[in-house]
């Protein structure tokens, strides 16, 4: 990611009237003057040929004298740039485009009165197109020597600055357009997000996975343990659920013969909002026939290594002042061993004693325990409360209980646990994968167990999906599947504290009037 430079840190010192409405009125009056003069305030005829950062890169290391020598030989570098006015200091104007910033030089003796008047009337936030040639200032800053300038869009509201900026973090989320306009860190974050998604797609395609699309509205919610959003299809007169995961549809594609598939898309869960959770989130899910969960752990290590190297240039990163290494191999630790390592005063000899687990969870950890909770559910609660937040370096937790893994294949060594893993980094889950359960009878039994939990009051338990059981009956080859939370991965790679920092338009509470 690019680092802010001195030019980017400068703020316009123009005095802004205390009454914002007064300034808005002034901007509106300028627009009316433009219209009255017969000019088009919103033309669409300027053709940009050059970008700010491309020019900065192309002329890096070329001195002011070298540029001047080329000019003297009639070899001026003609450019056409466009962007938003971020700073106006008379002789120099700074504009910003999608790649960065560049200065414009106003040579007053070389410009006609009309152009000078147009330049003088510019306000911060106006969008201009400029034709000219490259130069370099005495301070070493690259600039475009203005020959022609055209106002492309007149701003009718004042831009935030250090005196009248976005008041708080919530204001940034609600006004992302202003946040992007004025905050370089925010722009960098979402550039990295774009690179992460395109990098994942490139990696999967190189691994011979096929990208697919599956329904966003499901007749039965499934594929994960979560509470769904409910809607209604008027024409079909039936309830539908925004998907909580695409898993069951993707595995039906593997049944159909697409042996390596992936989907990058959003899922929806009608649950709480926090620094780690947003009701609408982006994930990649992928499935590979003739593979097991060990293969996917290996693939995940390669993916994370490649993304960090390609985007950041290193696998050694810092997240919230903590050094983290994304270099393979990652630690692999069973859930029971994680409990043994991190749960204080826990008697491992009683790891399968339900009464002891319930007492530890309720008394020591102050967790609500229901009668329907079995040994596996209680083990998972204890792991989540004692170990999860302490998994700072990349760690695969394996051997999840079958009770809390209704879609995962049972272990050949112990039918009470599954061939499943979750990847934790910085104390947060980033990925969940397992060897898929492809026994239709076992899957039906697991669904019935989930239905029993739902009947007992667990809103997040799964429904019984008869169509999926029927698909399994045709034969799902040995398969492994995984889901990776892209939002949390971007948080990690951009050192962002909150998931809202990496979602362009996060869900917010309704803003109260007045």
From Swiss-Prot:
Catalytic activity of the protein: tRNA(Lys) + L-lysine + ATP = L-lysyl-tRNA(Lys) + AMP + diphosphate
Binding site for Mg(2+) 2: 429
One GO MF term attached to the UniProt entry: magnesium ion binding
EC number: 6.1.1.6
Cofactor(s) it depends on: Mg(2+)
InterPro entries: Aa-tRNA-synt_II, aa-tRNA-synth_II, aa-tRNA-synth_II/BPL/LPL, Lys-tRNA-ligase_II, Lys-tRNA-ligase_II_N, Lys-tRNA-synth_II_C, NA-bd_OB-fold, NA-bd_OB_tRNA
Family annotation (CDD domains): LysRS_core (cd00775), LysRS_N (cd04322)
Keywords tagged on the record: Aminoacyl-tRNA synthetase, ATP-binding, Cytoplasm, Ligase, Magnesium, Metal-binding, Nucleotide-binding, Protein biosynthesis
Lineage: superkingdom: Bacteria
Positions that bind Mg(2+) 1: 422, 429
UniProt xrefs under Pfam families: tRNA-synt_2 (PF00152), tRNA_anti-codon (PF01336)
Keyword Cytoplasm belongs to the record: yes
Gene3D superfamilies, per database record: Bira Bifunctional Protein, Domain 2, Nucleic acid-binding proteins
Gene Ontology, cellular component aspect: cytosol
GO BP terms in the entry: lysyl-tRNA aminoacylation
Subcellular location per the Swiss-Prot or TrEMBL entry: Cytoplasm
UniProt key word Transport: no
Co-factor: note: Binds 3 Mg(2+) ions per subunit.
HAMAP family: Lys_tRNA_synth_class2
Family indicated by similarity: Belongs to the class-II aminoacyl-tRNA synthetase family.
Subunit comment: Homodimer.
NCBIfam families linked to this entry: lysS_bact, PRK00484.1
Descriptive protein name: Lysine--tRNA ligase
Lineage: Bacteria, Pseudomonadati, Pseudomonadota, Gammaproteobacteria, Moraxellales
Gene it is expressed from: lysS
């Amino acid at each position: 990611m690019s680092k802010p430079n001195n030019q980017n840190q400068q703020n316009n010192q123009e005095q802004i009237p205390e009454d914002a409405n007064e300034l808005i009125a002034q901007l509106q009056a300028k627009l009316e003057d433009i219209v009255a003069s017969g000019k088009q305030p919103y033309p669409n005829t300027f053709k940009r040929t050059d970008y700010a950062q491309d020019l900065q890169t192309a002329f890096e290391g070329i001195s002011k004298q070298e540029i001047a020598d080329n000019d003297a030989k009639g070899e001026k570098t003609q450019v056409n740039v466009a962007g938003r006015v971020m700073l106006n200091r008379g002789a120099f104007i700074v504009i910003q485009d999608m790649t960065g910033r560049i200065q414009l030089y106003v040579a007053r003796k070389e410009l006609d009165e009309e152009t000078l008047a147009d330049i003088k009337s510019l306000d911060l936030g106006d969008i201009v197109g400029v034709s000219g040639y490259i130069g370099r200032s005495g301070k070493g800053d690259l600039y475009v020597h203005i020959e022609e300038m055209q106002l492309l869009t007149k701003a009718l509201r004042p831009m935030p600055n250090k005196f009248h900026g976005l008041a708080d973090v919530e204001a940034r989320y609600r006004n992302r357009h202003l946040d992007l306009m004025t905050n370089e860190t925010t722009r960098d974050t979402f550039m990295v997000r774009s690179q992460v998604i395109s990098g994942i797609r490139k990696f999967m395609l190189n691994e011979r996975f096929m990208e697919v699309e599956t329904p966003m509205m499901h007749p039965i919610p499934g594929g994960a343990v979560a509470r769904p959003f409910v809607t209604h299809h008027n024409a079909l007169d039936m309830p539908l659920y925004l998907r909580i995961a695409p898993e069951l549809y993707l595995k039906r594609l593997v049944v159909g013969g697409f042996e390596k598939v992936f989907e990058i898309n959003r899922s929806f869960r009608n649950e709480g909002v926090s620094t780690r959770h947003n009701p609408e989130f982006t994930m990649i899910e992928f499935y590979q026939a003739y593979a097991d969960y060990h293969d996917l752990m290996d693939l995940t290590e390669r993916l994370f290594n490649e993304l960090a190297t390609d985007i950041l240039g290193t696998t050694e990163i810092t997240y919230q002042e903590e050094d983290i290494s994304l270099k393979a191999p990652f630690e692999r630790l069973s859930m029971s061993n994680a409990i043994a390592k991190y749960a204080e005063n826990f008697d491992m000899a009683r790891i399968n004693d339900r009464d002891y687990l319930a007492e530890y969870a309720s008394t020591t950890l102050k967790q609500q325990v229901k009668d329907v909770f079995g040994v596996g559910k209680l083990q998972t609660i204890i792991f989540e409360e004692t170990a999860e937040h302490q998994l700072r370096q990349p760690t695969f937790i394996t051997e999840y209980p079958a009770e809390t893994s209704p879609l995962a294949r049972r272990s050949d060594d112990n039918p009470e646990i599954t061939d499943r893993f979750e990847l934790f980094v910085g104390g947060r889950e980033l990925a969940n994968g397992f060897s898929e359960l492809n026994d239709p009878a076992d899957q039906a039994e697991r669904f019935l167990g989930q239905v029993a939990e739902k009947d007992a009051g667990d809103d997040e338990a799964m429904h019984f999906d008869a169509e999926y059981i029927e698909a399994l009956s045709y034969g799902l080859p040995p398969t492994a599947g995984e889901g990776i939370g892209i939002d949390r991965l971007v948080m990690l790679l951009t050192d962002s504290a909150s998931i809202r920092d990496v979602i362009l338009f996060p869900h917010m509470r309704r803003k109260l009037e007045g």
